[in-house]
Amino acid sequence: MAHRHFPALLLALVAAPAALPALAQDAASPMPVKVVVVTMFEIGQDTGDRPGEFQNWVERLPLDEPVAFPQGYRDLRLNREKGVLGMVTGIGTARAASSVMALGMDPRFDLSKAYWVVAGIAGADPEDMSLGSAAWAEWVIDGDLSHEIDPREAPGDWPTGYTPLRHAEPYAKPVPENDEGARYRLDPALVSWAYELTRDTELQDADALSELRQRYVNHPEAQKPPMVIKGDNLAASTFWHGKLLNDWANDWVEYWSEGQGNFVTTAMEDTGTLQSLTFLDKAGRVDRDRVLVLRTASNYSMQHEGITAAESLSGEKKGGYSAFIPSLDAAYRVGSKVVLELAGNWDRYADTLPGER
């Protein structure tokens, strides 16, 4: 398929730093990429300081070659020998969608067979997941696309002020067929393969995390040590928190997945990423079936017993992001097993998805 490239993009590439000439001059013969690692934020530099989601990948995989990416949120990183490309999208669905689309249309890369591994931290439903754990999602549901009225003005029998697009009541049936990007289902066989490959991964734990987990006395899953699980993701650009919104998230995921999904993690980007990958798939630029979403628990999505949602969100009674560093570590430990397996056995996975074998 012939690809058109936007003039503005080509101008941006021409203007890329001279320190990175090779990729900028290879548009006529794009570099095949085996795996794209998608992270959402970094705190400072790519290496050597307090880490965000990207730094472990840069230092440990490693992603040792910087690649100018002026049309995106942050420059890319590449391991040329392994064929692995890493990116930071920026926080929120808008930046994620824009950055992924910019990469997908970048003429320097052939992404037609690339696997995409989204690896980031998230809030976790204590009913299903413990701090420091990792969850592979099959369903990714958008938490922004909706109608909304303030629940204080809603009818008394409404459980929420949110209603699905094109419906006038919460959770009205039938579920809209034209969902406008409200739901995405990843390839179930690929997700199961990733889970089976990584389910026995040893994850970081600490006494402070164990102490916090034990405060969730009515949530047995929240009290368990970190582990790898399967669980679905709600993506919304609003950082919400608290029991009532946690109940809404469970109902919203159940509704849009038509009872097949279970809300486990909450993050801010993944429907934006998947929307762009869906469009890029239509253009023949990527394979939408080669996408995995891994989210690790940096905090719980609701308060434990004895404190309010506001206190929990502000961290007034300990907690907050107590699992920040362990969750970053888990995203790399678990995600890298999949990335290295795919990239290291490319003759096996280039033309056949793992779950299809």
Question: Positions of the model-derived regions?
Answer:
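Bacterial N-terminal signal peptides that target proteins for export
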Residues: 1-9
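N-terminal signal peptide c-region/cleavage motif recognized by signal peptidases
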Residues: 15-19
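Sec/Tat signal peptide C-region and signal peptidase I cleavage site
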Residues: 20-24
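Accessory terminal and edge-of-domain segments that mediate assembly/interaction
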Residues: 25-357
